[in-house]
Amino acid sequence: MAKHKTHFEECDVLVVGGGMAGTGATFEARHWGRDLKIICVEKANIDRSGAVAQGLYAINCYMGMQWDENQPEDHVRYARNDLMGMVREDLGYDMARHVDSTVHMFDEWGLPMMKNEKTGRYLREGKWQIMIHGESYKPIVAEAAKKSADKIYNLSLIHISEPTRLT
C-alpha cells in the first residue's frame, strides 16, 4: 500500500480542481489578487484534466461584436427561446458581453483558431460557433494557470480535516 504524504501550506486562495473552471479561476485569482498566495490542487494533471482536455472543434459562444455580427441582446433572445423562457436574462447578458474578450485572450495565448485569411474574422460553423483546433485548448489555459499560481499540486487529493482546514 502506498504511503500518502501530507503537505501543510498556508494560502490566500485555494483552487480545488484543475479543469477549465479551476485553471480559469487560478488565472482570475492572480489577476484580481496580485499579492495573494494562490495554490491549485488537481487529482490528475492540469495539462490534460477535465472534459475540455479531450479536445474541442469549436467555441460555442462568440458574439463577433467588433464586426457587428451579434450583440449580447441577441444571445439572450436565443437562450430564452432555446430554454423555453427558463433563463436569468441578466446573467446571460453579462456572460455574453464578456465572451468575446475571453476568446481574443485565448487567441493571443496561441490557441489555433480558423480565420478568414482576407478579413481576419473567425470562421463560423453557425450563428454562435467559431472553429478552432482544440487539441491544444486545455494545455494553453493550463499554462496560464501555471504562470498565475504560486504552487500547483498535480496527482493530489484533499481531505477536510477541520471546518477551516484541508489536508
Explain the meaning of each model-derived region.
Residues 9-11:
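Core beta-strand elements of the Rossmann-like FAD/NAD(P) dinucleotide-binding domain
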Residues 16-17, 43, 162:
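The Walker A (P-loop) glycine that initiates the GxxxxGKT/S ATP-binding motif of P-loop NTPases
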Residues 13-39:
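N-terminal Rossmann-like FAD-binding beta1-loop-alpha1 element of flavoenzymes
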Residues 3-5, 37, 43-157:
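Conserved N-terminal/central alpha/beta ligand/cofactor-binding core
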Residues 158-167:
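Single conserved hydrophobic/aromatic residue that forms the stacking wall/gate
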Residues 25, 141, 160:
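Aromatic/hydrophobic pocket-lining residues that form π-stacking "cages" and hydrophobic walls in ligand
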Residues 1-3, 25:
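A generic local structural motif
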Residues 25-28, 49-54, 165:
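Short acidic, glycine/serine/threonine-rich loops at helix termini
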